């Protein structure tokens, strides 16, 4: 059976469901299509930064968030030092959270459904059709049926199968991430701090360009994981599952870990807007599909929620009829400066000696680590007037001017 909607959203994760909710609230007839049945799991650290918390509050989820664990900031460990940094930045809530993706994604999807978006779950989009002017006029499902649309939002994740059909290209000369996470029982599962171990070593003792994490979930378990940065020239030199098991053994006594990590899932993450082909006449890529992932920590939920809202606003504003250049331009206005300088810093971390030399120095400076937490947490806005924000924006402008490939191009 074929159907039709004003807006079709492919993907019911945080980005797609946020876009669907905002578009439905603007009066659009919305259909969300996802290959999975919900609830479903997703490879993720489950962390919700203060910026992500702010977006969830915009969606009306404040009361739901109040029932979840709250974290005051980030505890960082490594190179012989430990430091706790409260979440900085004047423009966002003072706390973060962590919610398993089986719960978070289904909750945001339910918000979109309550707002009027229709759900087609367990249904995969495999292709699109175009009208005579080149606009997408329908998505093709794996059973051969179609869903017609006036506008299309693609939020099908980092690999973005539909994005590739539409012409998305991933440029691997900048950094990308590889990561794995699991869940493990710990008596510290209700701690009000998330922990990152910045001195991530392989079982052979080699310092890796990445970090390990322990994110308390408040349910008796922590999200445990490891992630590493890589480039086409310097691919990740680590087998992820053995590395996570080794990391768990290192943390076992300190965290009272019980058993082995369960439900291990890994991911490959394009980062920092390292894709082109993110829009066409009546379609846009958002969230992970548009490589909206922080190059310094692999976080993407806040960008997914934001780009979902921004895409819906662009679609429903009535002022733009062709998104081919409007959407990349909007993404660049919001994220290109930060992504550009973050990609350069992350690239330095892939150099074998850089982290070993700079890590011990940085970890002994509360000022440097406060700056690091703020930029890693995406906690700088254009409205912030303090010196850290001004320096970060200036560095982003300078970095963008010398980019061989600007983010999203």
From Swiss-Prot:
Q: Which cofactor does it need?
A: FAD
List positions binding FAD.
11-15, 44-47, 101, 125, 288, 300-301
GO MF term (any one): FAD binding
User: Which catalytic reaction applies to this protein?
Assistant: menaquinone-9 + AH2 = beta-dihydromenaquinone-9 + A
The protein's superkingdom reads: Bacteria
State which Enzyme Commission number(s) the record gives.
Answer: 1.3.99.38
Q: In which pathway does it act?
A: Quinol/quinone metabolism; menaquinone biosynthesis
User: Which InterPro entries does the record associate with it?
Assistant: FAD-bd (IPR002938), FAD/NAD-bd_sf (IPR036188), Geranylgeranyl_Rdtase_fam (IPR011777), Geranylgeranyl_reductase (IPR050407), MkRedMenJ (IPR054880)
Q: Which PANTHER family match?
A: CONDITIONED MEDIUM FACTOR RECEPTOR 1, GERANYLGERANYL DIPHOSPHATE REDUCTASE
Q: What is this protein called?
A: Menaquinone reductase
Q: What is the lineage of its organism?
A: Bacteria, Bacillati, Actinomycetota, Actinomycetes, Mycobacteriales
């Amino acid at each position: 059976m074929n159907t039709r909607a004003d807006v079709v959203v492919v993907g019911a994760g945080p980005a797609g469901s946020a876009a669907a909710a905002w578009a439905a609230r603007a009066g659009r007839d919305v259909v969300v299509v996802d290959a999975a049945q919900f609830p479903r799991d997703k490879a993720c650290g489950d962390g919700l930064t203060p910026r992500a918390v702010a977006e969830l509050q915009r969606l009306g989820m404040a009361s739901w968030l109040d029932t979840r664990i709250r974290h005051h900031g980030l505890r960082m460990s490594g190179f012989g030092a430990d430091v706790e940094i409260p979440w900085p930045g004047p423009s966002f809530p003072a706390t973060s959270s962590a919610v398993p993706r089986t719960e978070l994604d289904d909750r945001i999807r339910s918000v979109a459904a309550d707002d009027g978006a229709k759900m087609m779950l367990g249904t995969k989009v495999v292709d699109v059709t175009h009208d005579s002017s080149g606009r997408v006029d329908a998505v093709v499902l794996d059973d051969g049926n179609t869903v017609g649309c006036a506008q299309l939002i693609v939020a099908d994740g980092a690999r973005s199968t539909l994005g590739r059909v539409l012409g998305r290209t991933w440029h691997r000369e900048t950094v990308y991430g590889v990561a794995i996470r699991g869940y493990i029982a710990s008596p510290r599962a209700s701690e009000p701090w998330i922990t990152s171990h910045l001195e991530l070593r392989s079982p052979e003792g080699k310092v890796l360009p990445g970090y390990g994490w322990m994110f308390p979930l408040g349910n008796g378990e922590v999200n445990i994981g490891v992630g590493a940065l890589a480039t086409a020239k310097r691919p990740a030199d680590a087998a992820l599952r053995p590395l996570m098991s080794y990391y768990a053994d290192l943390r076992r006594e300190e965290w009272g870990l019980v058993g082995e990590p369960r439900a291990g899932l890994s991911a490959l993450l394009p980062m920092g807007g390292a894709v082109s082909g993110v829009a066409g006449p009546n379609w846009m890529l958002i969230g992970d599909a548009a490589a909206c992932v922080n190059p310094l920590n692999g976080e993407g939920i806040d960008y997914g929620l934001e780009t979902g809202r921004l895409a819906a606003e662009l679609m429903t504003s009535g002022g733009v009829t062709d998104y081919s250049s409007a959407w990349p331009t909007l993404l660049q206005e919001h994220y290109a400066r930060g992504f550009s300088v973050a990609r350069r810093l992350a690239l330095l971390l892939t150099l074998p000696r850089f982290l070993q030399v700079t890590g011990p120095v940085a970890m002994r400076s509360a000022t440097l680590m406060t700056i690091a937490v703020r930029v890693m947490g995406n906690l700088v806005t254009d409205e912030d007037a303090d010196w850290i924000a001004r320096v970060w924006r200036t560095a982003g402008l300078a970095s963008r001017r010398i980019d061989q490939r600007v983010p999203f191009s």
